[in-house]
Amino acid sequence: MVTIKTQSYDDFRCIADRCPMTCCQGWSIKVDQNTCDKWQKDQNTAYLMEYTVSRGEDVPREMKTNEADACLLLDNQGLCKVVKRHGDGYLCDTCALFPRKKNQITELNDVDEEKVLIEEYSLSSACPAVMEMLDGLESSLGLEVKGECEDGIHFPMEYRVRNTLICMIQGESIYHEFSLTERIMLGFSLLHECLDCDTEENVDDCLEVYADIENLREKMEYWEEMEPAIQDTMEELCQTFWNVTEYYKELPMYRPYVYDAACKVDSWYPERDTEAAAAMRAQAYGTWEQHKQKFAEYDSLAQRILASEIFSDCISDDLGELTEYYQAIVLEYIMTRMSIFLLGDYSKEKVQLYYSLYVRIIGHNAEGMAEYWEENFEDSILEQEYFYLLLS
């Protein structure tokens, strides 16, 4: 069996009270049954069950939260009371494992038993400490490989597609010729063509086509000829921003990050248009290209984040679902770029923080995003033209 880890996996350490966006606030913290049993069996920790709530017989219990959506066991210094009083060994799996991720690549053997071919270990970029580690890497994401596969192993089709996406995003080999947004678009184009394939052999043929530099150049020439109007691009970006943040902008955890930007979008596109709103939009149109150039200074970080998230999340055995995950990962990039534009703060700390924010909002809610696309576009797989518009 082969084990693959992202370069920084073993180096991760929680920064606890120094974290600018704690993982103890803003989402549900599931408490696994083994932890519940462990707490209840020890008279010193039995009281911890009072800080949990049941959501139903067939689902794990959750930690109770306060009005700010923070875990009740988070103290005023940003430290966990469970760890302070009882040690790391009494954390529930959710808290002990985050932001670590583990995936297994499997196949069925001759008697239809599942056999593990590869175990992959990675870190979620929703954690600001992980984001800092990604920023500190000198080049690509970096994968540490141990072990060997048996001869004759046939890796799943979706796994081969995912690995091609990672190579694309990181600008490896022939993909180095293209900009980050071009590589993102080529990846989406590849997925669309794979979805149209009838057989696995056709998918392999498609992967070969996307290893041909002349074919890639032709595809980018096609997209560049579209030249979407800045008015259309800005309107769709603002609409997307508004839709994604509508729920979160009023939540205590997320309001400080997205409320002001959402208000700016509202002022650009009021229910009844005004001359003042039109003037603000015109100013935005005029500075968009300059913004993209400034944000591109963080392309090396962005490509590592994208590659890391693709490595972690695009592991479905269904190409359609894999494409939905890819869309969500790219939307994290689009939303971060748009937020920085709206706020006008291009500091490294701000870019990292907003990237972590949108990995939480979007990446950890991929199923919800698929439902959103289905509801608004009548298909959870976006059209390529619309995808290109958002990247423009």
For the regions a protein language model found, what residue spans apply to each?
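Hydrophobic, aromatic-lined core segments that form the binding pocket/scaffold
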Residues: L180-S392
